Amino acid sequence: MPKEKNKEKLILDAAIRLFTSKGYQATRMSDISQEVGMSKGLTYFYYKNKEDLFMALTKKAFDQFKDEFREVYLSKGKTGLEKITDLVIRVVDFASKNQILYDAIINFMDLVKKYNQEESRKEIDPLILESQHFQKLLEIHHEPAKFGVMMVSQGIKDGSIRPELQPEITFYTIWSMIIGFEKMLGPVGYDGKEVKINPESLQPGFLKLLQDMLKGTIQASKPATVQTSLF
């Protein structure tokens, strides 16, 4: 079993290198076999097809992502708000250093959105649906976010985050903001843009806005009371 796991890892690591350098579409299973020095037949023994291999890669991505979230949550001497702030920095750093893995995570989110609806589920490649790794991902893809929810809950308890916020809704809102923030680093980093902003100024601005929202310095305005007469 250890030898088999090692071969699976060799194939997966080779796939990550080739998907990163050549792109997913341009990479063939034979390229991966050649990269790892293994017969094509043996490669197919461990992974049924490229789609199955990519789902295995996605599972690896979620496992590493969960480790990032766990490490932030378990860090000592920090408030919930400080942990959320650290998490933003860690996610962006993870995406920068492991772009193919981060992209796989975002791609899976799109797949789940399609999977949830019977009509759009038909648009998913059947080879993906057949992958045991895809089925496993359906079970575990919320696990990283569970640590984020616990960070928000901690912040509410320690007073660093507004007490009226609901932990699950709050974290998934934060999570969607982080995804959008990471995506915008490309456009704001483009030299030909006309807006006066760059990645170096966007990150501290994003963090301050997020902190202010969670601390409650940005309060929703209450509608003014309108007094009326019955007569």
Please tell me what each predicted stretch does:
Residues 10, 18-60:
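Helix-turn-helix
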Residues 82, 86, 112-158, 169, ...:
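Amphipathic alpha-helical packing segments from all-alpha helical-bundle domains
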Residues 6-7, 14:
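N-terminal positioning helix adjacent to the helix-turn-helix/winged-helix DNA-binding module
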Residues 99-120, 176:
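Short, solvent-exposed beta-strand-terminating loops
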Residues 56, 71-103, 167-174:
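Hydrophobic alpha-helical connector segments
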Residues 90-94, 146, 150-158, 172-231:
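C-terminal peripheral helix-coil segments that are non-catalytic and often amphipathic
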Residues 21-25, 76, 98, 158:
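Short coil/turn segments at alpha/beta junctions that flank glycine-rich nucleotide-binding fingerprints
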Residues 14-18, 35, 94, 177:
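Short amphipathic alpha-helical elements of helix-turn-helix/winged-helix folds
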